[in-house]
Design a protein with these regions (language model features):
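N-terminal capping/interface segment
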Residues: 1-10, 129-137
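Metal-dependent phosphoester-hydrolase catalytic domains
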Residues: 2-16, 21-54, 63-67, 178-180, ...
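Structural motif corresponding to alpha-helix initiation and N-cap regions
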Residues: 30, 110-114, 140, 316
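N-terminal targeting/secretion presequences
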Residues: 59-60
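Structured beta-strand-rich core segments of catalytic domains in phosphoester-bond hydrolases
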Residues: 65, 69-91, 107-108, 117, ...
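Active-site beta-strand/loop signature of hydrolases that rely on acidic residues for catalysis
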Residues: 94-100, 116-140, 156, 202-207, ...
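Acidic/histidine-rich helix-loop elements
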Residues: 97-113, 212-249
Length: 357
């Protein structure tokens, strides 16, 4: 029995390492394996179970799960960081990013602001970056209300049937904006140049390719995880899901490289860079590793816990991110799960400007 447990523990450690470092795989070369980062919560949990088992059954073997967890410390911290609480200093900039799902949760009575709108207006953010925003044009439209509050705004629609796009509300002048050229019918990234007290800052707002999974497919996946589906059906649906995930990941990879090239260009120009938005990918992914090269993940540096930002069945991870260059020090990053008017939760943090001498 003990030998079986040891073997099972070793397999759990191997799975943790393979999943944890799967962000090294390029999606075009490894389309199916590059998605295993989605399993990170499951493999962490499995290794924690062995930690508890050895404490109870055989403390002398406690070193085995501890060694596995230490070997995977970096990806575990990427997935679920823990940081001491630090108050943001006076003058730090607050940035909020949110996929608002075309404001589908925006419901108002005559003359009344919705919960979604109150949240945005009360956020007191210096920068609000929205994805899947729509400009409805009526007197209570979200973007019109934000334009009343913020001196500088820009809405860049996507040329598609939905008419949604990316939006930036800023307390500081927006000098220019430039869409990053990659082919996609429903996704886009925009490079905004903002003047913050004489310092030019690049803010890249992103809505990258999704996995393309429908609500029903997410619910089916949730039932599979719970063991509520017959084995044959579960196998077929799982294979179909893996195929769909692979296609979405491969398409996203091409977009990611275009955005990463723009980030590196801006860094070479000596500009402070913030890249944020709906990356549609987890902290354990090619997307995250490629985009965060030369940048700091604000949530990993100053947030706590897994920070699940997509709130529908089956996806238990953070797919919305804020990255910054070393011109900034991040504080208090948080995924705010108190508001449920979109299929994403907003993510925000404070950024202290620290110009180089």
């Amino acid at each position: 029995m003990r030998l079986l447990l040891v073997v099972a523990n070793l397999l759990a450690i191997i799975a943790l390492l393979l999943v944890g470092y799967s962000d090294l795989l390029q999606p075009e070369a490894w389309p199916k394996l590059s998605n295993v980062g989605l399993l990170m919560p499951a493999v962490i949990l499995a290794n924690l179970v062995f930690l508890v088992l050895w404490i109870l059954l055989r403390p002398r073997l406690l070193w085995l799960p501890v060694a596995g967890l230490l070997l995977a410390f970096v990806p575990i911290r990427q997935y679920t960081p823990f940081n001491p609480t630090e108050e943001p200093p006076h003058g730090a900039l607050k940035l909020l990013s949110w996929n608002v799902a075309m404001f589908e949760g925006y419901v108002t009575k005559e003359g009344e602001k919705s919960e979604m709108m109150r949240y945005l207006l009360d956020s007191d953010a210096d920068f609000i970056c929205l994805q899947e925003a729509t400009d409805k044009g009526d007197s209570l439209s979200p973007l019109k209300l934000l334009r009343h509050k913020y001196a500088y705004t820009a809405f860049i629609p996507k040329a598609s049937e939905t008419g949604h796009g990316l939006f930036l509300a800023s307390r500081y002048p927006i000098l220019s904006h430039d869409s990053i050229p990659y082919h996609s019918p429903g996704n886009m990234s925009v490079d905004f140049l903002v003047d913050v007290g004489g310092q030019k800052v690049c803010i890249i707002n992103n809505h990258l390719q999704s996995y393309g999974i429908s609500e029903k497919e997410r619910e089916d996946f949730h039932h599979i995880l719970q063991g509520d589906v017959e084995a044959d059906t579960a196998r077929i649906e799982t294979l179909q899901l893996i195929e769909k995930l692979s296609k979405g990941t491969t398409r996203r990879a091409a977009q990611v490289r275009m955005v990463a090239a723009r980030i590196q260009q801006r860094l070479k120009e000596g500009l402070p860079v913030i890249a944020c938005g709906d990356f549609n990918d987890t902290p354990i992914s090619y997307t995250h590793r490629t985009l965060s090269k030369g940048l700091t993940d604000c949530y990993i540096a100053s947030g706590n816990g897994p920070g699940r930002s997509f709130n529908r069945n089956g996806i238990y991870t953070r797919i919305d991110h804020i990255l910054c260059s070393d011109f900034f020090k991040p504080y208090g990053a948080k995924v705010d799960d108190s508001i449920h008017t979109s299929d994403h939760y907003p993510i925000f943090c404070w950024l202290e400007m620290r110009p180089k001498p």
